[in-house]
Amino acid sequence: QTMGIFRQNNCASAALPDLISHEDWKLVLMECKMCPRDATKWSVQVGFFDGEITSKVLPIHQACALMAPREVIETLVKCYPQGIKMKESAFHRTALHIACQTNAPIETIEALVHFYPEATRIQDALGRLPIHYACAHEVPSSTLELLLREFPESCKIGDQNGWLPLHVACRRGVSLYELELLLDCYPQSANTLTDKGSSPLMCAQKGNSRHHEEMVQYLEDYIKRSEQNEKDLLSFDTWEPARKLSTIHHRNVAAKG
């Protein structure tokens, strides 16, 4: 699911959610200073996802959805430290999931990871990690680097349909540098299939992003190199024992002579 512009919330007393909805960040900071408890209050946001799906959220979820600046995120965390660990009700996503889904500034992602690094390991109701959403929304390379540095094993984790972050990246389109980051993290993912049998190459072939053609070419070359390397290793494994046996034979002959 992707983020949509959500409608006005139905909580008349929730001043902070209203201010966040209007992206009035100066007033948001003032409200947090005057009434820090507002950061702990949940509100029902109609159309929070895709403009259709309603969810019960905290102010920090709202702020991440609207790409709030780092200062706002840090203030909300200080007002309610546990809030960064809480999940919205529709898809059980943390603030980091939502920030990656909306292509939030790298400064915001850095703050979220700093305060709650474990969020990089949390799967939502669809089995997706924050990195799945980062790969789906063409985030800056720095965001992908940060997520991989914090949790390298994320490259090996599939969602409920068996999609690794690489499958998502290939389907939606990323730069070759980002593609290399994912492959370097988990080389075997190049040949990993989704539950329905799609390889990363097949996902790239179905894509229509501006990176489409170069991604397909890169993956084809990468797979060929991998296959050749495997053949070379097999040839070496076969050749090496034979060479040793030949050496032993010549030594035995020499000893008898």
Describe each PLM feature range.
Residues 12, 56, 91-92, 127, ...:
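Start-of-repeat signature of ankyrin repeats
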Residues 2-66, 72:
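N-terminal segments that cap or nucleate solenoid repeat domains
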Residues 27, 71-72, 107-108, 142-143, ...:
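Conserved ankyrin/ankyrin-like repeat signature
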Residues 30-46, 74-84, 110-120, 145-155, ...:
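Ankyrin repeat domain, specifically the short helix-to-loop turn at the C-terminus of the second helix
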Residues 18-23, 62-69, 98-105, 133-140, ...:
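Ankyrin repeat A-helix N-terminal signature
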Residues 4-11, 15, 185, 196-257:
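Ankyrin-repeat-protein effector appendages
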Residues 93, 98-102, 106-107, 111-116, ...:
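Tandem repeat protein-protein interaction scaffolds
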Residues 42-45, 52, 87-89, 122-123, ...:
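Ankyrin-repeat boundary/linker signal
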